[in-house]
Every structure is written in structure tokens, then in C-alpha cells.
Amino acid sequence: MDNIYIKQALVLKEVKHVFQKLIGEDPMESMYMVDTIQRLGIEHHFEEEIEAALQKQHLIFSSHLSDFANNHKLCEVALPFRLLRQRGHYVLADVFDNLKSNKKEFREKHGEDVKGLISLYEATQLGIEGEDSLDDAGYLCHQLLHAWLTRHEEHNEAMYVAKTLQHPLHYDLSRFRDDTSILLNDFKTKREWECLEELAEINSSIVRFVNQNEITQVYKWWKDLGLNNEVKFARYQPLKWYMWPMACFTDPRFSEQRIELTKPISLVYIIDDIFDVYGTLDQLTLFTDAIKRWELASTEQLPDFMKMCLRVLYEITNDFAEKIYKKHGFNPIETLKRSWVRLLNAFLEEAHWLNSGHLPRSAEYLNNGIVSTGVHVVLVHSFFLMDYSINNEIVAIVDNVPQIIHSVAKILRLSDDLEGAKSEDQNGLDGSYIDCYMNEHQDVSAEDAQRHVAHLISCEWKRLNREILTQNQLPSSFTNFCLNAARMVPLMYHYRSNPGLSTLQEHVKLLSNNAVAGAERHVVHILCLQFVIE
């Protein structure tokens, strides 16, 4: 691997030189560079350059908004708007206001401008609540692109247009995109494109090697833990658990963080199984009380598998807290304990509903269901794993479930319930938001209820977009992690309608091929194929 790192350094040096030159000489071309770098999933190499390019473009964009819109192509207005907003630079949506009064002219002028329409459609996904002009622009682009597709079904860009309409960039992880859109960029024949392509290939090789080693370590950790021997009924899915941190911690250097985060994620899944299927209400109450006390005493009445699960939870959490204390000088144990208590209380509430046959009101279900996703537990752990200074003030914000964590959890809960309803996978035992909503609104059809849930998910994404633009105390790296978690949801829950899943499956299969040897590899193959349908 030494040679590949040497080669990476040489190519990286050349690309950085080209990038820095573009920032100074051609700000618009630097936007294409930023866009391509992000699509290729290599932005972790260019954080300073990307920020410098965006700062310069933000100054140009903000100082001459109307002139900029009038004197540039549609794609040259929409692309900087999207890139700036997704990095937290607020840009007024007024730049698209002229579409309201000139829709006929816009249709005539841009009906065949695929690049411009796609750029604008992608930009409208960064809207926040109340930005009607962006909503209108997005709807108009959607119409025009669909019309273009009907006229050009055999065009070499037709597949790309269809993919964009189904899965816009903002909601996807670049790593799992089969993205032909890069070819639309203006510099595709230049030396900088060749360098970027080479750098992306090198990066993919390094990431694949790193991930394979991590899967080996996760697999060994889980086997040595022995929990699967005692808790035989639990879903044995170390690959599925690992996929979340693998997708959200995108920098290859965060190897330790990905492995550490897999551990609490595994417990969220296992404890969820215990509460859903394998524990009586009395046992689950004792189990939850033990978590609240954070001690193993007075648990004699619990079955052995619950006792062992409690012990593993204590050990993993205390070990995690000790590592964070050594690294940051801050002990997060109280925050971690509170996150687990919240989760267990939510699980227990659902167990009470199931035991009594009670179907709660939709708002009550959703408020509890947001917590029972386990998102807060996972994101709290991820917060402490990152490389930034930690203080009591920021910890208090994370501890109190800020909007960005709430939104990610709500998107996951609603997406899970929506996919279950569409595929008829819900077993009806613990209900879903759609069940509760239709029980409240007897005149609503299942299709209308599903459209309502899809609308709620869309609104929550707008709140997430607002959080990107909000100047709060949360580090940008944590914000990006939360966004990646939300982007991972469609891959994990919308598998029947998401072509990106095939890329995810292939990636997991490739990793498992090299990470696990001999007879065990066959088991992992089965697991990696099963995790997407459970």
C-alpha cells in the first residue's frame, strides 16, 4: 500500500495546484471543480480549497445577485447556489423569483437545456420552509425534465435525467451513486479531469482496503464478544451495523471511529429485538429499570440473555466513555447513559402499547417513535468520536436533542413506516405511523396516508436544510455526519425503489470477499444480501 499512497500524494499535489489556480483566475470553473470533487467522494482532500472557492463565489453572488442571474447561464446560477447552501453559506432564493412571472418564456428558453434544468432542479432541493419560489422552480423543472424524457427516450443523457428526478444529489451519498452526471462538466477533456479521475480511483482503492480491514475487526469483535452464543435469536448483522458508520464517517482516516460506532449501533438493533419479540412486559420493565440505575444488581429475575446484554451494554458504554476521556479530557458517561435511558423508555412505551392492544394517536406514536429509532443514541456517540474540542456548552446542546438530530430521527421513522406500508412488510404487531393516522382519519385511503407521510419527510428535509444554514455551535463535521445519516436512510429502507442499493450491495459483497476468509465468507455473503431485506 505504500506505493499507492505515494502516487496519491503526487496526483493530489497536481490537482491542488490546478484547483488553487482556478480559484484565482476562474471562479465559475472552480465551482465545476468543487461539484466534481464532491460527486467523486474525494472532498476530504480539499476542505481548504473548497471553502476558499465558495467564499469567493459567495462574495460575487451576494454582491451582484440580480446582475449575476441575468448575465450567466442557468446552470452557472443554480450550481453555485446549491454548492454554497449545502456548505452553510446562505444565499437568497430571490435569484429564482423571475421564474414566477416568466414561466412561458422559461419553458421556451430552457425546454431543451438539460444541464440548466438539472442544475436548477438540484438547487431547489436545498430549499427551506417558506421559500415558495424554490418550490415553484423545482416543480417547473420536474415538469420540463419529464417532458424532455418523453421526447428523448433514446438520448445518451436520458438515464441520467431519470436518475436525477428519482434521486437528487442532496439526498444521496456520492459513494453509492453510479453517477454519469460528472461527464456533463465542461472540463471533461482537460488534464484536470484526468487527474481527478485518477485521484478518485486511487481513493477508491484505499477506501476499499481500509473498509475491508475494518470489517475484519468488526467481525472479530463480534465473535469474541460471544453475545451471539447467548442471545441466539437476535439478528446477527455486523455488516449492516457497520454500514452506517462506513457511510457517515466518509474520511478514510476515521477508521477507529467507524469501528467504535459500530458497537453501540449493534446494541440498538439487539435490544430492539428483545423488546419487540423476546421479552415479557415484566422482564422489559426490570431491564429498563436496570439501565436507569446503571447497575447489574437486582436483575436475578431476568433471563440469562438479558443479563448478558445488560453487561455488554455497560462494558461497551463505559469503555467508550473512558476512551473519550483519555482523548478529550471530558467524561461523556452521563450523556451516554441518558441517551440509553431515553431509548429504553421509548421501547418500553411501545411494549406497553403492544401488550394492551392500544393504538396511539399519530402524534403520540411519532413523538415516541422518533426516540425509538435509536438515532439520538448513535449520533451522541458519533459526536464524541470526532476531532474537535468538546465543552459542556456544546455537550448540553447535543444532550437535549437539537433539531438536526430530531429531524434525522423523524426522517428515519417515517421512511421505515412508509416503506413497510408500501411493501406490506408491517406485521401489524407494533403499528406504524400510517396505521395510527388512518385510525384517526377513517376517510383517508392508504395511498393518501402514504402521500401524507412523504410530505412530512419532505418538510423534515427542509428543516434539515435550515439547520445547515443556521449559525449554531454544532461543528460542521457533526452536521455533515447527521446529513449523511439522513442520506443513508433511503439506501437502508427504500431498497425496492432505489437503484443506489445495487451499488451498496456490490460494495458490501466486494468488501466481505476480502475481509473474511474460508467458510466464514459464505456466511457473510448471506448476511450482506439479507440485511437489505429485513
Swiss-Prot record:
Mg(2+) 3 binds at residues 416, 424. It catalyses: neryl diphosphate + H2O = nerol + diphosphate. It is found in: Plastid, Chloroplast. Binds 3 Mg(2+) ions per subunit. The keyword Plastid applies. Its EC number is 3.1.7.13. Keywords: Chloroplast, Hydrolase, Magnesium, Metal-binding, Plant defense, Plastid. Induction: Induced by salicylic acid (SA), wounding, and after feeding by cotton leafworm (Spodoptera litura) larvae. Pathway: Secondary metabolite biosynthesis; terpenoid biosynthesis. Belongs to the terpene synthase family. PANTHER family: NERYL DIPHOSPHATE DIPHOSPHATASE, CHLOROPLASTIC, OS04G0344100 PROTEIN-RELATED. Monoterpene synthase that catalyzes the hydrolysis of neryl diphosphate (NPP) to form nerol and diphosphate. Is specific for NPP and has no hydrolase activity toward geranyl diphosphate (GPP) or farnesyl diphosphate (FPP). The monoterpene nerol may have an insect repellent effect for the plant leaves. This is Neryl diphosphate diphosphatase, chloroplastic. It comes from Glycine max (Soybean). The gene is NES.
